């Protein structure tokens, strides 16, 4: 097969040689014989068959197509002959021949031949027949083509024939012929477009403006600017002319007038002037082709077709011109110094430049310079100079030096920022000096100017650096790197400094290395960066910490200098970098407030080494990881973690930007009012400096003043050169001056002049700040320091302003004293102020003539192609007027607006602009764009709607993606995502440091290309990263995610954009109203080589331009303003196109959140784990406890015991904290802080191994046949009778959010959402809980739901220190009822397994401390020895990360099994609890870590988490210390461990103690942000091994009774608190106290039986109402423990109250044996058991049913049924509390008694019913019968007396219910 080869720069002969070769012609012949196209998008028409039949024409067209294809090649391409013919050629010919006709083919062949062969090809007349000739209002398209042809053929002839080349001659000739042709050929055009007559006048104006833009530098290159601007402007004018003619229907379609002119006229002119036989002809023409192609792509509309899909160009702007030229040159010359690519890749490759357009142009000129030398052998000084001047922005550099000089003259000092800028300018100067020394030679004039500017800048910097400013300053930005020795923190600091220097443009000598042990700051010269290595490693008289206090401050601080002339130097460096081994202040640091030191470290980096990564000498950061620490709440918290250096650098740069903005805001007002103080209080202090500089000065003074009276009182002030000699000036303390002229010894000259600089600066500072110098003089300092204005005797002889003005100032000038004039003249000499002309202008004026002559001579000898190309590049830099015109025209649309814009743009008539603008209603909004008006575009034709939501959307969702100088618009989406456009982001193939600028702030981000998802059949792409800052999830509703359903086919929309203007350096929010339409039709987006075909788009008529991509299309959808699309491309400069939003899924949100919450636009109080995102809507209220249920008992009940506990703080403003520093303590808010800092990520491999080991142990102890699947909702609600650990769901607790919002007075808990008989309940259909349960059941199958929890302060007893010293109330989280039910369904069996197998597993949930289980735990721990770690965690609830929770979910799924659906549900349920919303009073918070305390699996998950942490760090430590691998894999054999939530005990075998102990474990966990302390002594700084007898677990100790028996005594401090405070929620105080006292006696028995007996006696003696039978005896307690140890009575609640057992009622009333189904007390009163009877469905009119303690909702019962519920009183045998009995039974008018009497009166049977246990109901029935006279008191007395005889504890009935015993 024959291959065609195309490559950049390939000559025409090479192309023809290939296409005329025999092998290729064989393929052509085969192609001519075929009648198939083999392409779906190409149709074989009659015209195509006619072309194939004519062999000569076919061959000519193939040659033309090959030459055309060659011009598009940017890199070498090999193509099969058949691929070329059936592909490119067939596509091109099909479009030309089929759509345009044979005449168009003729013109195509002629154009290609004329362009490449420079010959005019004549074709037989048969082909000139016009198949399609379009006429429009008498305007013939053929005549337009003839016009362009005439212009194209005239230009080269005219240029060739010109003698005495001049710019004016060319422009005049162009103008003359251009008008002549238009007048003769198209007379209508001049009438339609009269502005054509002024085009060339406007071009001349643009050239003059461009010359002015660069002052003297461009004086000699006006020829280049003429070529460039003439080319660009002519193309622009012709293009506008064509668009207007089409609009006015003089043309039916575009014929690309400007393109034809550009490709023929300009190129042909260059060819005629540059011989084809000249050296480098082919290459030079390729360069010109690159330039003209770029012009066509940027300035002209690009029309191209040929396929069924429409191709659209991605939007471009003037910067694109230079990008395209750079890309073309790179492809032509592979040896270019830099390789500049397309789009943002090109910008990124020069990211080290200063982000200016001139820098980019300088690089392009460098490529042209290299090209001219290598190809043409032409060494051009102009291109070398231009590359330097533009590439390094020499002009701007000189202007800034001039501004700094003038600022110094006006103030006599340089500020902190000015010195910083001097350092930046010095570095740029040094780089330019290096370029001149190593690169191409520049002109001597340019070189000398740069060297002079650098010398002046060095002098200015030297003078300012030794001065210091006694005024307010910015607080320096401090970065501390902390870590262990040999972790590379010093290297890290060095690398950070280097990168900060590069980022800020600073040089290497801008760092001062400070030794804190030295008193003096020797060598300090106001360097912007100070580095302190090994901070505080060595003690000093003034500690390093103490020194830092004054350095990091905004107040002036004078540093101690050794030299007297440097006294008064103040510190004002802007950066401090330090490395240290210490986190805290040294005990000898003499710092009285540690926080003052801590707060001065703005970035504190904790440097760690990655154990799995080897050290790399070429990249020491490869094995480092970084934790960012912040000190808060008494500890260091990890606020960010980075695994690579680039992300750390981005974080530091962002923090510095924030710090800098804060400092600017803080000091703005202070700087306005601040007054600079001189370092010299008296003039004699200035004079005394001379004695310290040089011995030569003193000798000169003595010799010169030998004859002067009082010579010893004079001090030499300065010596400066003047008129070939040296002027000497001396002064005394009385301001008297002596001056003389004389020589200076050569050996002392430099020394004397340098000393004079310092003294002059001091004198000038003293003078300028002196009260003697009047304000008028200060305002004219430039003239007064001009040395030309002083005569030989230093008398002022100049003129200030015009003569009249000077006369007004003459009195003030004459008032100047001699020492004033002497100092002003001296400082003028020092600053080089020889005349009033500004320094910057003098620099250029000095070389103006030299450059003009050199450049004009050199450029005249260049080949024309090089002139045109360079001219085009120069216009890209300085053609501001032209580009402004282009911007106006491209934004003017295609209608009447374009006509008006063309008239204004190309006319030289002055226009007036109103100096007031239309008020913008959006300026009153508090958005980022408040002070930047949202302006309507020139082509917008409607007023913006009154709805402010459009601006709100812009503020919330718009952002800019900034890479170097490129600003791309992006759209932020909730879930840490943004939407971009593919033709931009596809070029970013490597990680990059970028900036994200939102409406609120700008931050650095490390862009990771792998996180970008490109959407199929869309031009949009979606980027996601956890490092992106999220936006409010309420913004989700601002997007139209379902356009097929919501969006109409046609609609009116707002085109909203916020672009960065590279010219004004500002943000420009703009909008326009567009009429949009959804089009389902293929269109292709083109951007260079990029192609993407999309089937659906939003289209609108709008002349959009480059950088519009990313703009939002916003319209009203369903009554709400939403984003419906994102702009991605434009076509024909009149059609805009947007892509519909990609099909994204929302992040899981809590159902109904928007109904109850007002979400903030941004998050507040954000930390790593939490952020405040909203608040409850007005008038909504979450009921929380406001007062404690704990009641203080009388003093005598305390029995002399101490108590250090009080009830916790439940509300803000607790009166106990009034008038204290904690008066504003908020317990709800404080409880959230534990979630602020989750633990760091763990190594995934090691974590996986750890979890697998735990999972294997679960399987090892799994009983055969044990059920692990999910349970039914009935079992989840009611539990399973007879099965341990399968208890029912507690119904008295809160129902959670949002159900609590519907709670009415008197209602509480979950009971109101269930129905049943009290034992078997079910959800009531139709309630909010039932509906939420159904919804959540479906949701968890596919996604992680977002829960809403209520943070509720915990009502408990706390130590005094946690209430008064440092308040700390614990919160528990109330989760929704439906979530708790589902968790029970899917995890109840797993929980049952964990609790049941606690004898072999570490988790001890369910342990009975009174039983033998405690002894078993002790035995397990002792099996490894007696070295035990007793551990406690800090803020354990907030540590758990999503990484750990996901691992636990996977473990449980693998263990419990089930299908994919069940596993997904389990995992989503678990993941939901560590990513939720929390309501704290009226605030709504987002929490992204930890386990809520109200989670049903909290204690189980925490126990497993506890075990994972210990086992993970065990393996980690043993691996780090190279322990035998057998030890690493033998945790179970070498470690015994028990856990209960965050409590643990770890018994360590002696063989692994060298590798695993408390110190190593504490340090290893701290590396991951986990703080673990000694569980016994929480204040201890160490974690040491303890004996088992010294440990505690669950606040219980280990007391050995025998070799096998261990007791678990509770801490006495907890026991005594039970006697001081009791909970009276469900019983009376006496009953509650007695219950607590019994528990205390039991616990004391485990401490010492004797102590228990004595305490019992004390209680009976001190409390009169106690009976001996109320308290258990020693033997009863002993028997209790015996039963517990035999496991006769399991204890599920850690305590057993036998007095609450209903069995105490015995068989009374029903007699001996099994209870019966019913008890008939009388004909009208009966008690029934609902196990055997059912509640009636309707009212039969004969019975009244009273149900007790069932769950039947009253509203669902028939009218004759009534439901009552009571709480059982403790010690009352299942009977209700005394309060309930008194309220409902004793009180005669209670509702219950009224029901009884009403039924009796109606002769209805009264049925009292309950389920299961009717014994208490029997007693209540007797009491009700007595109270309502249903039974006589004699009968009720007998019954109750019998009952009390069997259960003597019920004796309280005789006193509480006397009516049942006596007739009262």
From Swiss-Prot:
Domain (SF3 helicase) ranges: 457-622
Transmembrane segments: 892-912
Entry EC no(s): 3.6.4.-, 3.4.22.-, 2.7.7.48
Domain Peptidase C3: residue ranges: 943-1146
Signal sequence interval, chain numbering: none
GO cellular component, as recorded: host cell endoplasmic reticulum; host cell membrane; host cell perinuclear region of cytoplasm; membrane
Pfam families: Peptidase_C3, RdRP_1, RNA_helicase
Residue ranges of every copy of the RdRp catalytic domain listed in the record: 1426-1556
GO MF: ATP binding; cysteine-type endopeptidase activity; RNA binding; RNA helicase activity; RNA-directed RNA polymerase activity
InterPro entries to which the protein is assigned, alphabetical: DNA/RNA_pol_sf (IPR043502), Helicase_SF3_ssDNA/RNA_vir (IPR000605), Helicase_SF3_ssRNA_vir (IPR014759), PCV_3C_PRO (IPR044067), Peptidase_C3A/C3B_picornavir (IPR000199), Peptidase_S1_PA (IPR009003), Peptidase_S1_PA_chymotrypsin (IPR043504), Rev_trsase/Diguanyl_cyclase (IPR043128)
Intrachain S-S bonds: none
Binding site for ATP: 483-490
Keywords: ATP-binding, Covalent protein-RNA linkage, Helicase, Host cytoplasm, Host endoplasmic reticulum, Host membrane, Hydrolase, Membrane, Nucleotide-binding, Nucleotidyltransferase, Phosphoprotein, Protease, RNA-directed RNA polymerase, Thiol protease, Transferase, Transmembrane, Transmembrane helix, Viral RNA replication
Residues annotated as site: Cleavage: 315-316, 915-916, 943-944, 1151-1152
Single Gene Ontology BP annotation: proteolysis
List of residues that carry O-(5'-phospho-RNA)-serine: 916
Catalytic activity: RNA(n) + a ribonucleoside 5'-triphosphate = RNA(n+1) + diphosphate
Catalytic residues (positions): 983, 1019, 1109
Protein name from the UniProt record: RNA1 polyprotein
Organism: Red clover mottle virus (RCMV)
């Amino acid at each position: 097969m024959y291959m065609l080869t195309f490559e950049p720069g390939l000559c025409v002969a090479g192309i023809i040689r290939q296409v005329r070769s025999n092998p290729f012609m064989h393929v052509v012949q085969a192609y001519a014989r075929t009648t198939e196209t083999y392409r779906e998008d190409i149709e074989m028409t009659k015209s195509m068959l006619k072309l194939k039949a004519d062999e000569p024409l076919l061959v000519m067209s193939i040659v033309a197509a090959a030459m055309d294809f060659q011009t598009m090649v940017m890199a070498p391409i090999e193509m099969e002959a058949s691929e070329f013919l059936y592909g490119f050629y067939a596509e091109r010919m099909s479009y030309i021949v089929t759509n345009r006709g044979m005449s168009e083919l003729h013109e195509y062949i002629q154009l290609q031949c004329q362009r490449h062969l420079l010959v005019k090809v004549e074709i037989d007349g048969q082909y000139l027949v016009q198949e399609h000739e379009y006429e429009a209002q008498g305007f013939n398209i053929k005549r337009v083509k003839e016009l362009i042809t005439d212009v194209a053929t005239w230009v080269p002839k005219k240029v060739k024939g010109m003698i005495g080349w001049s710019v004016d001659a060319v422009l005049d000739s162009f103008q003359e012929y251009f008008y002549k042709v238009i007048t003769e050929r198209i007379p209508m055009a001049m009438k339609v477009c009269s502005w054509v007559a002024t085009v060339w006048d406007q071009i001349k104006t643009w050239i003059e403006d461009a010359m002015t833009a660069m002052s003297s530098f461009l004086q000699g290159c006006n020829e280049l600017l003429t070529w460039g601007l003439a080319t660009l402007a002519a193309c622009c004018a012709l293009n506008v002319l064509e668009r207007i003619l089409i609009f006015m229907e003089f043309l039916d379609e575009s014929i690309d007038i400007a393109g034809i002119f550009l490709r023929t006229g300009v190129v042909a002119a260059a060819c005629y002037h540059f011989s084809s036989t000249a050296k480098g002809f082919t290459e030079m023409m390729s360069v010109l082709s690159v330039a003209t192609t770029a012009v066509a792509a940027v300035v002209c509309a690009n029309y191209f077709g040929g396929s069924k899909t429409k191709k659209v160009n991605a939007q471009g702007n003037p910067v694109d011109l230079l990008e395209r030229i750079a890309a073309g040159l790179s492809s032509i010359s592979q040896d270019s110094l830099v390789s500049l690519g397309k789009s943002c890749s090109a910008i990124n490759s020069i990211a080290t430049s200063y982000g200016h357009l001139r820098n980019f142009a300088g690089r392009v000129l460098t490529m042209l310079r290299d090209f001219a030398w290598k190809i043409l052998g032409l060494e051009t000084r102009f291109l070398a100079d231009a590359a330097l001047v533009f590439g390094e922005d020499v002009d701007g550099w000189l202007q800034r030096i001039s501004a700094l000089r003038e600022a110094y003259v006006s103030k006599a000092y340089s500020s902190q920022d000015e010195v910083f800028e001097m350092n930046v300018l010095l570095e740029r100067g040094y780089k330019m000096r290096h370029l001149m020394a190593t690169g191409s030679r520049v002109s001597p004039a340019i070189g000398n100017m740069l060297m002079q500017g650098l010398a002046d800048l060095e002098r200015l910097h030297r003078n300012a650096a030794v001065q210091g400013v006694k005024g307010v300053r910015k607080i320096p930005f401090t970065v501390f790197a902390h870590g262990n020795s040999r972790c590379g923190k010093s290297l890290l600091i060095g690398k950070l400094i280097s990168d900060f220097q590069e980022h800020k443009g600073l040089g290497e000598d801008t760092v001062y290395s400070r030794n804190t042990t030295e008193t003096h700051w020797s060598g300090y010269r106001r360097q912007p960066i100070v580095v302190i290595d090994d901070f505080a490693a060595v003690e000093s008289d003034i500690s390093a910490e103490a020194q830092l206090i004054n350095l990091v401050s905004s107040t002036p601080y004078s540093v101690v200098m050794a030299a007297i002339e440097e006294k008064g130097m103040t510190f004002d460096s802007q950066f401090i970098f330090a490395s240290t081994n210490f986190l805290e202040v040294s005990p000898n640091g003499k710092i009285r407030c540690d926080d003052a030191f801590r707060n001065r470290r703005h970035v504190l980096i904790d440097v760690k080494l990655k154990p799995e990564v080897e050290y790399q000498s070429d990249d020491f950061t490869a094995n480092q990881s970084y934790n960012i620490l912040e000190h808060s709440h008494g500890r260091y918290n990890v606020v960010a973690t980075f695994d690579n250096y680039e992300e750390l650098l981005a974080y530091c740069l962002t923090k510095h930007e924030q710090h800098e903005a804060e400092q600017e805001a803080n000091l703005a007002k202070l700087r306005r009012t601040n007054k600079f103080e001189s370092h010299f209080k008296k003039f004699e202090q200035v004079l005394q400096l001379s004695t310290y500089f040089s011995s030569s000065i003193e000798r000169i003074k003595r010799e010169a003043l030998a004859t002067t009276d009082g010579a010893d009182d004079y001090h030499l002030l300065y010596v400066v050169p003047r008129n070939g000699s040296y002027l000497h000036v001396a002064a005394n303390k009385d301001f008297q001056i002596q001056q003389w002229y004389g020589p200076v010894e050569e050996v002392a000259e430099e020394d004397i002049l340098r000393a004079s600089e310092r003294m002059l600066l001091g004198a000038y500072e003293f003078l300028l700040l002196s009260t003697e110098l009047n304000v008028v003089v200060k305002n004219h300092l430039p003239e007064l320091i001009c040395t030309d204005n002083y005569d030989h005797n230093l008398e002022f002889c100049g003129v200030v302003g015009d003569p009249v003005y000077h006369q007004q100032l003459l009195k003030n000038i004459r008032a100047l004293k001699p020492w004033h004039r002497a100092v002003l003249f001296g400082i003028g000499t020092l600053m080089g102020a020889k005349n009033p002309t500004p320094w910057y202008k003098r620099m250029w004026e000095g070389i103006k003539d030299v450059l003009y002559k050199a450049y004009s001579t050199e450029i005249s000898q260049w080949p024309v192609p090089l002139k045109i190309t360079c001219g085009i590049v120069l216009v890209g830099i300085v053609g501001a007027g032209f580009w402004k015109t282009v911007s106006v025209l491209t934004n003017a649309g295609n209608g009447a607006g374009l006509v008006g814009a063309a008239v204004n743009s190309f006319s030289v008539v002055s226009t007036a602009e109103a100096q007031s603008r239309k008020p913008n209603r959006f300026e009153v909004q508090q958005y980022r764009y408040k002070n930047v008006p949202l302006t309507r575009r020139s082509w917008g034709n409607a007023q913006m709607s009154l709805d402010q939501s459009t601006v709100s959307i812009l503020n919330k969702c718009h952002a800019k993606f900034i890479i170097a100088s490129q600003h791309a618009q992006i759209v932020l989406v909730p879930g840490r995502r943004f939407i971009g456009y593919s033709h931009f982001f596809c070029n970013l193939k490597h990680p990059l440091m970028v900036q994200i600028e939102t409406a609120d702030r700008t931050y650095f981000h490390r862009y990771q290309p792998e996180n970008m998802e490109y959407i199929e059949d869309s031009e949009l792409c979606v980027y996601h990263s956890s490092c992106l800052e999220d936006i409010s999830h309420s913004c989700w509703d601002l997007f139209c995610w379902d356009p097929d359903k919501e969006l109409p086919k046609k609609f009116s929309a707002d085109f909203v954009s916020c672009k960065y203007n590279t010219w004004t350096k500002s943000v420009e929010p703009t909008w326009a109203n567009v009429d949009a339409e959804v089009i389902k039709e293929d269109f292709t987006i083109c951007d260079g080589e990029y192609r993407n075909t999309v089937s659906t788009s939003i289209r609108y008529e709008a002349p959009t331009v480059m950088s519009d991509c990313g703009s939002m299309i916003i319209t009203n959808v369903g009554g709400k303003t939403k984003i419906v699309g994102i702009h991605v491309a434009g076509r024909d400069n009149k059609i805009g196109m947007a892509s519909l939003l990609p099909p994204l899924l929302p992040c899981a949100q809590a159902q109904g959140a928007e109904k109850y919450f007002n979400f903030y636009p941004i998050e507040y109080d954000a930390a790593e784990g939490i952020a405040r995102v909203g608040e409850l809507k007005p008038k909504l209220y979450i009921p929380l406890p406001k007062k404690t249920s704990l009641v203080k008992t009388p003093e005598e009940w305390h029995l002399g015991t101490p108590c250090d506990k009080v009830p916790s703080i439940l509300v803000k403003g607790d009166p106990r904290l009034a008038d204290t520093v904690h008066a504003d303590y908020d317990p709800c808010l404080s409880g959230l802080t534990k979630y602020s800092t989750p633990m760091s990520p763990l190594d995934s491999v090691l974590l996986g191994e750890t979890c697998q080991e735990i999972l294997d142990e679960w399987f090892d102890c799994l009983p055969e046949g044990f059920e692990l699947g999910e349970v039914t909702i009935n079992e989840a609600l009611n539990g399973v009778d007879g099965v341990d650990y399968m208890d029912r769901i507690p119904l008295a607790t809160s129902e959670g959010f949002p159900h609590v919002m519907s709670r009415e007075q008197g209602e509480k808990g979950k009971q109101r959402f269930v129905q049943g008989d009290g034992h078997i309940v079910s959800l009531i259909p139709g309630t909010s809980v039932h509906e939420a349960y159904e919804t959540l059941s479906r949701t968890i199958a596919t996604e992680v739901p977002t829960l809403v929890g209520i943070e509720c302060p915990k009502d408990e007893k706390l130590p005094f220190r946690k209430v008064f010293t440092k308040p700390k109330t614990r919160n528990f989280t109330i989760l929704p009822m439906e979530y708790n039910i589902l968790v029970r369904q899917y995890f109840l069996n797993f929980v049952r397994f964990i609790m049941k197998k606690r004898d072999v597993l570490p988790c001890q949930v369910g342990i009975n401390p009174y039983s033998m289980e405690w002894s078993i735990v002790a035995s397990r721990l002792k099996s490894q020895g007696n070295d035990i770690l007793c551990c406690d965690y800090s803020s354990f609830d907030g540590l758990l990360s999503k990484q750990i929770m996901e691992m636990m979910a996977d473990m449980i799924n693998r263990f419990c099994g089930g299908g994919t659906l069940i596993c997904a549900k389990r995992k989503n349920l678990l993941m939901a609890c560590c990513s939720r919303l929390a309501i704290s009073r009226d605030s709504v918070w987002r929490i992204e870590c930890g386990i809520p305390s109200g989670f049903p699996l909290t204690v189980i998950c925490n126990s497993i988490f506890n075990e994972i942490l210990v086992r993970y760090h065990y393996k980690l430590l043993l691996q780090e210390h190279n322990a035998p691998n057998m030890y690493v894999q033998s945790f179970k054999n070498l470690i015994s461990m028990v856990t209960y939530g965050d409590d643990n005990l770890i018994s360590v075998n002696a063989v692994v103690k060298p590798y695993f102990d408390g110190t190593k474990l504490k340090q290893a966990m701290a590396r991951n942000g986990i703080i673990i302390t000694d569980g016994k002594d929480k204040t201890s700084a160490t974690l040491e091994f303890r004996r088992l007898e010294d440990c505690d677990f669950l606040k219980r100790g280990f007391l050995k009774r025998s070799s096998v028996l261990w007791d678990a005594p509770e801490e006495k401090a907890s026991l005594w608190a039970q006697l001081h405070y009791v909970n009276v929620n469900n019983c009376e105080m006496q009953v509650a106290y007695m219950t607590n006292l019994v528990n205390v006696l039991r616990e004391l028995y485990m401490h010492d039986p004797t102590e228990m007996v004595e305490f019992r006696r004390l209680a009976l003696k001190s409390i009169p109402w106690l009976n001996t039978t109320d308290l258990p005896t020693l033997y009863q307690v002993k028997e209790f423990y015996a039963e517990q140890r035999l496991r006769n009575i399991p204890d599920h609640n850690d305590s057993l109250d036998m007095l609450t057992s209903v069995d105490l009622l015995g068989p009374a009333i029903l007699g001996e044996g099994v209870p019966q189904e019913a008890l008939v007390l009388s004909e009208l009163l009966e008690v029934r058991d609902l196990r055997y009877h059912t509640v009636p469905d309707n009212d039969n009119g004969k019975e009244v049913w009273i149900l007790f303690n069932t769950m039947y909702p009253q509203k669902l019962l028939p009218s004759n049924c009534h439901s009552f519920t009571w709480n059982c009183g403790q010690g009352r045998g299942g009977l209700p509390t005394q309060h309930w009995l008194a309220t409902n039974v004793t009180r005669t008018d209670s509702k219950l008694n009224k029901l009884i009497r009403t039924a009796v009166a109606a002769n209805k049977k009264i049925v009292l019913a309950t389920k299961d246990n009717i014994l208490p109901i029997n007693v209540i029935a007797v009491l009700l019968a007595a109270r309502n006279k249903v039974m006589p008191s004699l009968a009720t007395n007998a019954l109750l007396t019998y009952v009390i005889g069997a259960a003597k504890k019920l004796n309280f009935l005789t006193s509480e219910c006397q009516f049942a015993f006596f007739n009262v």
